[in-house]
A protein has these predicted regions:
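Short, basic, glycine/proline-bearing loop/turn elements
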Residues: 52-56, 95-96, 127-134
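Active-site glycine- and acidic-residue-rich loops that bind
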Residues: 57-68, 97-104, 137
Length: 206
């Protein structure tokens, strides 16, 4: 189940097709699929259909709305995971004056949804803009999360690209900055920009 506050349903599906097929996103948008990519395209359509992804792009999503929607879907059949993009666009649904308090409230309520339904909840969240002005010291930390929200999280991960490294603009790191029940650290990854897809660095070298 995917709650998308960042982009509409159609745009999200197009990006998923690009990720699954490896076909250039702009080519998919324009309907110009290379003839030698039709096999990958139809395989991606079949794969997307088999994943049975439910996308909810309702505006002004609140924790209460997420909770009730999850319960309704759980009654119809088990959900494997919940994704939400993004935390900073959520509304609390109650009166909270300060934005960081609203973010913390929403994050805590989403944690409750995860525990009540015994299901993982993955939440995207923005970084503070100040990180862009730190030059070569721009490696993200928990303090860089915009308006907080990290306290209730079991795991916090960042995607980081060292802009001082000109060897490969697509080489990045998955930083595990917090893990309540496990180790932290970094994993090298490779970003295929035309398909909006991250891969393990080892796989990308093959």
């Amino acid at each position: 189940l995917m709650f998308s506050l960042e982009m509409p349903h159609q745009q999200l599906v197009m990006r998923l097709l690009a990720q699954l097929s490896g076909i250039d996103y702009q080519a998919l948008r324009a309907g110009r699929i290379p003839e030698d990519k039709y096999t990958e395209y139809y395989a991606a359509l079949d794969r997307l259909d088999s994943l049975d992804i439910i996308i909810d792009d309702s505006p002004a999503i609140t924790p209460a709305y997420v909770s009730s929607t999850v319960k309704n879907h759980m009654a119809d059949g088990k959900l494997d995971a919940i994704f939400l993009d993004s935390l900073n666009l959520m509304k609390s649904g109650i009166r909270i004056d300060r934005k960081f308090e609203e973010i913390d409230y929403c994050a805590t309520e989403l944690k409750n949804v995860a525990r009540e339904n015994n299901i993982p909840v993955w939440v995207a969240h923005q970084m503070n803009r100040g990180i862009d002005y730190r030059g070569n010291e721009s490696r993200p930390t928990l303090a860089d999360l915009r308006e907080g929200g990290e306290q209730p999280a079991d795991v916090v991960m960042f995607i980081y690209h060292d802009r001082a490294d000109d060897k490969s603009i697509n080489s990045s790191s998955l930083i595990i900055a917090k893990q309540r029940n496990g180790p932290t650290g970094e994993i090298p990854v490779y970003f295929r920009a035309n398909a909006f897809r991250f891969e393990s660095a080892a796989k990308a070298r093959l």
